Amino acid sequence: SFSHIWVQFVFHGVAGAGWQPLVRPPRLGGNRKMGVFATRSPFRPNPLGLSLLKLERIETEGGVRLWCGGADLLDGTPVLDIKPYLPFVEAQPDAAPGFAAVPPVPLEVAWADEISAASLPPPNRLLIEQSIAQDPRPAYQDTPQRVYKMAVDDWEVAFRIEKGMALIEAVMAVEG
């Protein structure tokens, strides 16, 4: 009956990429450097990651399966450990957020007229919209009319940002 869990994992998608003691956090515009331990960068001296996930349900038929929301993991991410989140132990109302004092505002997302969002299965459409709403562009790039591309699950998504709104211009299945 826990509502949230901690998931400790390995940043396997950047394994072997190396690390630097100073990184450029997107929340600072991508131009200012900070010590890697003061950030959530995956490029660390060890590949360990930690995420707090909403535990939506647990299935126990044929093994144990946890259904979670809010994951910032790649498919196939190696999970090392799972622990319950205990608000009375871990929630610190007087904690200082450092350089991330203001939460980011999600972008409004629209689909270009020539694209039929209805042709995508609803879970894929929702995943694409939620991913683009987080504004995945490099923080220092805010060029109107520039088309950005990113992989979301088995799709390549092309989008642009104009006046604080994301417009999805193309979605193509990626052959894998």
Swiss-Prot record:
The domain of life for this entry's organism is Bacteria
Give residue ranges for domain TsaA-like.
Answer: 1-94
Protein name from the UniProt record: tRNA (adenine(37)-N6)-methyltransferase
> What does this protein's UniProt record list under function?
S-adenosyl-L-methionine-dependent methyltransferase responsible for the addition of the methyl group in the formation of N6-methyl-N6-threonylcarbamoyladenosine at position 37 (m(6)t(6)A37) of the tRNA anticodon loop of tRNA(Thr)(GGU). The methyl group of m(6)t(6)A37 appears to slightly improve the efficiency of the tRNA decoding ability. Binds to tRNA.
Task: Cite the source lineage.
Answer: Bacteria, Pseudomonadati, Pseudomonadota, Betaproteobacteria, Neisseriales
Q: Does the keyword S-adenosyl-L-methionine apply?
A: yes
Q: Name one GO molecular function term.
A: tRNA (L-threonylcarbamoyladenosine(37)-C2) methyltransferase activity
**Is Methyltransferase one of the keywords UniProt gives this record?**
yes
Extract the NCBIfam families matched here: tRNA_TsaA
Print the keywords alphabetically.
Answer: Methyltransferase, RNA-binding, S-adenosyl-L-methionine, Transferase, tRNA processing
Give the family this protein belongs to, as stated in its UniProt record.
Answer: Belongs to the tRNA methyltransferase O family.
Which InterPro entries does the entry mention? TrmO-like_N, TrmO_C, UPF0066_cons_site, YaeB-like, YaeB-like_sf, YaeB_N_sf
Which GO terms are recorded in the biological process aspect for this UniProt protein? tRNA methylation
Q: What organism does this protein naturally occur in?
A: Eikenella corrodens
Catalytic reactions of this protein: N(6)-L-threonylcarbamoyladenosine(37) in tRNA + S-adenosyl-L-methionine = N(6)-methyl,N(6)-L-threonylcarbamoyladenosine(37) in tRNA + S-adenosyl-L-homocysteine + H(+)
EC number(s): the record gives 2.1.1.-
What is the gene called? trmO
Task: List positions binding S-adenosyl-L-methionine.
Answer: 12-13, 40, 50, 74-77
